[in-house]
Amino acid sequence: MKTTFGRGTFVRAGLVGLALVLTAGCQQQMNDMTTKRVEFKAALNGASEVPQNGSAGRGELEATYNPSNRELDWRLRFSGLSGPVTAAHFHGPAGPGVNAPVAVPLNSTFVGTWQRSEITLTEAQAADLLAGRWYVNVHTAQLPGGEIRGQVVRDK
């Protein structure tokens, strides 16, 4: 038995193949959009504390948020503090110039002038972070209320 395929059969097969490729590509693009990591930063100083203090300390936070697992990977550098770090926290929800409770303690042993770690956020914490309602605060014995502070903002 001889089977022949007409031009219409090849056209239909080609269209089905094209549709499958496009569907797979769209699905991959949707997955990329929902798991795209978000970069954050903060510039810390004593003038951002509430109330302001005269600290000469400075700091910088860099963080990456992964929405697929709500994980925040952060790196904190600082210098010029009045003494060793006694504690550091993410606070929120709050905008610049407003104090807020601790949202997430940075439970790390701060050695030298920097630290790096990662934390998993709750849905509410992630929403506050993404909305720019978090700040990071570094405490020392001389300034236990906070020596340097910086608002956490998206790094464009």
Residue ranges and their predicted role:
Residues 1-24:
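Sec-dependent bacterial lipoprotein signal peptides
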Residues 2, 22, 26-88, 92-156:
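Metal-centered catalytic cores of metalloenzymes
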